[in-house]
Amino acid sequence: MTIPDLIALANARLANLTAQRTSAASLGDAVRMAQLDTEIAETEATLAALRGLS
């Protein structure tokens, strides 16, 4: 896989995580929201690192 491919996958993951967080928020699931916030932050950090390589 190339760096642009990995960036595309990370962007897709970020979009999915954001949608899941919106759903968890509408259900009032604070625990799941916190988990997703962590995953979103990790994915954003990965994206930043990948963008630094490209």
Stretches with model-predicted labels:
Residues 3-20, 39:
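Short amphipathic alpha-helical heptad-repeat segments
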Residues 8, 30-41:
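Short, charged, amphipathic alpha-helical segments
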